[in-house]
């Protein structure tokens, strides 16, 4: 699967997807991400499916789970969620079901067990201290809650699911995820990537960190 957050990453994702198909015949190629969510919701030209098999929108957990079920023969195309694909006759099929989501608190923590971060360099793109803060050094990137708790800024597209649908887990779940990630990575610095996480949730997380004596 390829997450395409910006227009500048689209071409490389399509090239890699095309290479993956040639190297691994039968693999399902899936594309999602921020650019897809904002720019590809109204597809009329199916040529992009020369490079990918499926395009998914918004949260990818359930769409990807259904695609795995489809490949294993456990469901049909009609069971797909927030997914677009090209039929054999060249027409495009949409299976949206936009309200189907796995609650954020029920998702498992990310698995870094076989991810060796020593193979990656620390990169500082700009001298701006704000940008350097979250890119210089190795940080555990983590989303504390789904969406934005405020979602009232005039400059923001609050119609997008990853902004407009707020879904926050309990502080206990957040701290347990943090402990799990630290145990796997050995890295104790965290960069929360939320649009705007609930202050009450963050306060609860901080209290638990202090109570449990967790060094982060």
Description of each model-found segment:
Residues 86-129:
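A broadly conserved sequence feature marking short terminus-proximal activation segments
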Residues 17-19, 46-48, 72-73, 110, ...:
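General N-terminal targeting signals
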Residues 81-82, 101-104, 109, 145-146, ...:
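Generic secondary-structure boundary/loop-capping signal
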Residues 113-216:
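Radical SAM [4Fe-4S] cluster-binding motif and immediate context
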Residues 66-67, 110, 177:
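Generic alpha-helical secondary-structure signal
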Residues 1-103:
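Glycine-rich beta-alpha loop elements in corrinoid/cobalamin-binding modules
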């Amino acid at each position: 699967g390829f997450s395409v957050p910006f227009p500048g990453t689209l071409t490389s994702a399509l090239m890699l997807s095309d290479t993956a198909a040639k190297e691994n015949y039968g693999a399902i190629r899936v594309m999602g991400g921020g650019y897809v969510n904002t720019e590809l919701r109204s597809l009329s030209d199916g040529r992009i499916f020369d490079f990918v098999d499926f395009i998914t929108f918004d949260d990818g957990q359930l769409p990807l789970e259904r695609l795995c079920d489809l490949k294993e023969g456990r469901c049909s195309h009609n069971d797909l969620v927030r997914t677009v694909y090209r039929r054999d006759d060249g027409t495009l099929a949409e299976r949206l079901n936009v309200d189907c989501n796995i609650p954020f608190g029920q998702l498992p923590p990310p698995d870094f067990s076989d991810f060796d971060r020593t193979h990656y360099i620390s990169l500082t793109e700009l001298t701006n201290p704000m940008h350097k803060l979250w890119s210089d050094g190795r940080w555990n990137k983590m989303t504390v809650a789904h969406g934005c708790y405020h979602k009232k800024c005039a400059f923001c597209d609050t119609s997008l699911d990853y902004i407009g649908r707020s879904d926050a887990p309990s502080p206990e779940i957040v701290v347990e995820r943090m402990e799990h990630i630290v145990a796997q990575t050995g890295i104790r610095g965290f960069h929360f990537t939320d649009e705007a996480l609930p202050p009450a949730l963050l306060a609860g997380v901080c209290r638990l960190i202090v109570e449990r004596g967790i060094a982060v």
